[in-house]
Regions:
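Conserved short alpha-helical segments that host acidic/polar catalytic motifs at enzyme active sites
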Residues: 1-245, 249-250, 258-291, 330, ...
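Glycine-rich oxoanion-binding loops at beta->alpha junctions
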Residues: 66-83, 270-285, 308-344, 350, ...
Length: 607
């Protein structure tokens, strides 16, 4: 959510800044802007809505200048309007900001009492006034920033231009990511390595409280105590090529269809097929001492964690606690020193999850993370890094990253079971074979795309939709409901099938489609009983099952979607596909913005 790009360059930077924003578009935004220093003036262009609107503004009113900053904004304080869009200009400074300044109200009151005028509703403008005030009092840019940063409470990343210093940008971070990039005769900063990848692969990640002075020929980094600091310069590995949709209508559609490939790529790091072994990509995981596992995540990653709870307890017989990251710290969880805490995040920058990780670290927990960005903040703070290999995921609604998380978590559960002596070599070989079958099974599920597209019109008119499942299919019901509400804006809820009679059944009538995830197996008959309860009250059922399940219970359903018969271990990876495709095709029918649904952000970097 929100994105920052900055360049201190050798030639005009406006187009490159815009290109950098395009690379950050996946993070989610509702307005955008660019500011450069041109002829001794701060020149700015801003637009509400998509980057296409900013492109039109730049075409009508071009910008020149070799130093500039750019920003995509996801509104927190103040509506998504041009007036609230970044960059903000306050006298001699212009700035962009990701995050939230929690104490902006008393700071704003202080500044208003001095007679300062505000032009926006944002918390960001407060920072601009504070820095401008220091500059107007005679401070250098460095001294002004050093004086202001200690006054800010919250999580933020900031980039500042100074009108009288046309070859300078100062960036700072606390709780939100910021990266500096080292070029040839010019330097950069960005919210992540992807933003600067076309210009440099040599980057450094700022630590908590760091601020950086970026000039054309040098970058100086200071810590929170204003002492010079050295941060390791690394090769980012971020692709400099733009991520294209190819022949697909949307990034989400493309990413759904990439799942067989990326799950196979991910499993290559965790499975030794010839040895019939699960192997984590670390030299020594020391899992035999784990007596309890704590899992923390948000959104789709949380549902992946719920599936993992079933697997870990079934295979390793290790008890699992799982929490939504935004609640974890505030309930003061009981954590025994030396326990293992597992954090799941696509971006590795999710603010709530990162804060929970640091809380667990303070409680002397060992930290394991499952992330799709191995250079992210969470990855850098982990004791045990478990990367997925989904590649860049542009669609805000997660699909392929979720499936890769499931693949990693299945491998972790099996590895933990072996470490605890709960898995025989033959059982481990069987798990390896089942995991190796997953990509082909996912591909078989994708073959039902046209069928699912044809039945989407049965769901699209609904105002409410229910999803039901038992066992590991219950988290998949939750995930299916989340996908539908995220991109189609239809109210949807997921429930454990056995909970229907405890309240949700009151919602059932002929206008409420009920999506049932029910592979044949030990829990199938129980789920069929719940389907009968729905049918008796006029509910319209869409049954997602295998051929055996559909033969037994498909009669009388509004529609059925046949999945391949698979082992229960990989069923969640397979059954993710139909709920993703159903949500996608319903959203297309309704004409929503599939890749960037309203009010949502890909990388949620505020609490």
């Amino acid at each position: 959510m929100c994105g920052i790009v900055g360049i201190v360059g050798k030639s005009d930077v406006a187009q490159r800044l815009f290109d950098g924003l395009k690379r950050l578009e996946y993070r989610g935004y509702d307005s955008a802007g660019i500011c450069t220093i041109e002829g001794g003036k701060l020149e700015r262009r801003r637009a509400e809505g998509k980057l296409d609107n900013l492109a039109r503004e730049l075409s009508a009113h071009p910008l020149s200048g070799t130093t500039g900053i750019a920003h995509t904004r996801w509104a927190t304080h103040g509506a998504p309007t041009v007036g609230n869009a970044h960059p903000h200009i306050v006298g001699p400074v212009a700035l962009v900001h990701n995050g939230i300044i929690e104490n902006f109200k008393p700071l704003r009151d202080e500044l208003i009492a001095e007679g300062r005028k505000f032009e926006s509703e944002t918390d960001t403008e407060v920072v601009g006034h504070l820095v401008a005030r220091e500059i107007e009092r005679g401070a250098s840019p460095e001294d002004a920033v050093a004086a202001v940063l200690p006054r800010l409470i919250g999580a933020f990343a900031i980039a500042i231009l100074f009108r009288e210093h046309p070859d300078l940008i100062i960036g700072a971070r606390m709780g939100a990511p910021l990266t500096v990039g080292y070029g040839d005769g010019e330097n950069y900063l960005g919210s992540d390595a992807l933003a600067v990848a076309p210009w440099t692969q040599r980057i450094a990640y700022l630590d908590e409280g760091d601020w950086a002075v970026i000039r054309r020929d040098a970058i100086e980094i200071f810590d929170r105590d204003n002492r010079p600091a050295q941060r390791e310069i690394v090769e980012s590995g971020a692709s400099s090529a733009p991520v294209e949709k190819g022949n697909y209508a949307h990034y989400m559609q493309k990413e759904i269809f990439e799942q067989p490939i990326v799950v196979a790529q991910t499993l290559q790091s965790y499975v030794r097929p010839f040895e019939g072994e699960i192997a984590l990509p670390v030299a020594e995981a020391d899992l035999e001492s784990v007596d309890r596992l704590t899992i923390v995540a948000c959104g789709t990653s949380y549902y992946a964690g719920l599936v993992a709870k079933y697997w870990v307890e079934q295979f390793a017989r290790v008890p699992v606690d799982i929490d939504v990251a935004s609640e974890f710290r505030y309930r003061e969880p009981v954590l025994e020193p030396g326990g293992l805490a597992l954090f799941i995040s696509q971006s590795g920058e999710t603010a709530d999850t990162l804060a929970a990780l640091r809380h667990a670290r303070a409680q002397k927990q060992r930290i394991a993370v499952v992330v799709n960005v191995p250079t992210s903040s969470m990855a850098r703070e982990a004791d045990l890094l478990l990367p997925t290999h989904a590649g860049p995921e542009i669609g805000v609604a997660s699909t392929k990253a979720f499936s890769c998380q499931l693949a990693v978590l299945a491998a972790l559960a099996a590895n933990l079971a072996r470490a605890k002596g709960r898995l025989t070599p033959d059982e481990e070989r069987a798990i390896v074979e089942h995991l190796r079958e997953a990509p082909a099974a996912i591909n078989a599920a994708l073959n039902h795309d046209e069928e699912i597209a044809a039945m989407a019109h049965l769901v699209a008119p609904a105002r409410d939709v229910l999803y039901l499942g038992r066992g590991p299919d219950y988290p998949m019901a939750l995930e299916g409901a989340l996908k539908l509400k995220e991109i189609s804006y239809i109210h949807a809820e997921g429930y454990a099938a056995g909970e229907m009679k405890h309240g949700p059944i009151a919602l059932i009538d002929e206008a409420v489609p009920v999506i049932v995830l029910a592979p044949s197996g030990p829990l199938f008959e129980k789920t069929v009983s719940n389907m009968q309860e729905v049918r008796a009250r006029g509910g319209k059922i869409v049954l997602i099952s295998d051929a055996k399940g559909i033969a037994e219970a498909g009669e009388g359903c509004m529609a059925t979607i046949e999945m391949p018969q698979v082992h229960p271990l990989i069923a969640p990876l397979v059954y993710a596909v139909p709920v993703q495709l159903l949500a996608y095709h319903v959203a297309v029918l309704k004409g929503t913005d599939v890749d960037q649904p309203r009010n949502l952000a890909k990388s949620v970097t505020v609490e």
